[in-house]
Design a protein with these regions (language model features):
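Conserved acidic carboxylate
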Residues: 11
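Charged docking surfaces used in two-component/phosphorelay signaling
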Residues: 18-26
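Acidic, metal-coordinating helix/loop segments flanking the phosphotransfer/catalytic sites
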Residues: 33-52, 92
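Acidic catalytic/metal-coordinating carboxylates
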Residues: 36, 63-68
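Active-site residues of response regulator receiver
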Residues: 56-57
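Short amphipathic alpha-helix used as the core "switch/output" element in two-component signaling
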Residues: 66-78
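Hydrophobic/aromatic residues positioned on beta-strands within the core alpha/beta folds
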Residues: 82-85
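C-terminal output helix
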Residues: 106-119, 123-127
Length: 133
């Protein structure tokens, strides 16, 4: 049997993060959780098995979800990116190439389908390696 996909979930709202993590874990994914972009970047440095980043747009700290997505795209091109928001719908030009967007609130099946689609887009790229930006 294949190893489960490893998802890094970045969401500052604890309830939203808990629900999303439960949905993803119930779908068979391994979920790592982070509350902000800085913590997520530290996790990526130590977890080369992360295959998909799923991040909220609006988060506290110096880097929001769009900034995190761009940084991850530049430093870890083997990681697929999914961005979610209930307040902001980014223009396609604001997103790194290959990034998908999902609007909140999202159905459980829509979330798992989006994660699988992002992961499929990354197949063949292997494990990521963090490069300094």
């Amino acid at each position: 049997m294949d190893n489960p996909l490893v998802i890094l979930l970045v969401e500052d709202d604890v309830l939203v993060r808990m629900v999303a993590a439960d949905v993803l874990e119930d779908a068979g994914f391994t979920v790592l959780e982070s509350t902000n972009a800085e913590e997520a970047l530290r996790l990526l440095e130590t977890r080369p098995d992360v295959q998909v980043l799923f991040t909220d747009v609006n988060m506290p700290g110096a880097l929001d979800g769009l900034g995190l997505a761009q940084t991850v795209h530049e430093r870890t091109p083997g990681v697929g990116i999914l961005i979610g928001s209930g307040r902001v719908r980014p223009d396609p030009g604001e997103l790194p190439p290959g990034t998908r967007f999902i609007a909140k609130p999202y159905a459980s099946s829509a979330l798992t389908d989006a994660v699988r689609a992002v992961a499929r887009g990354q197949q063949g790229r292997g494990e990521h390696s963090m490069t300094s930006g």
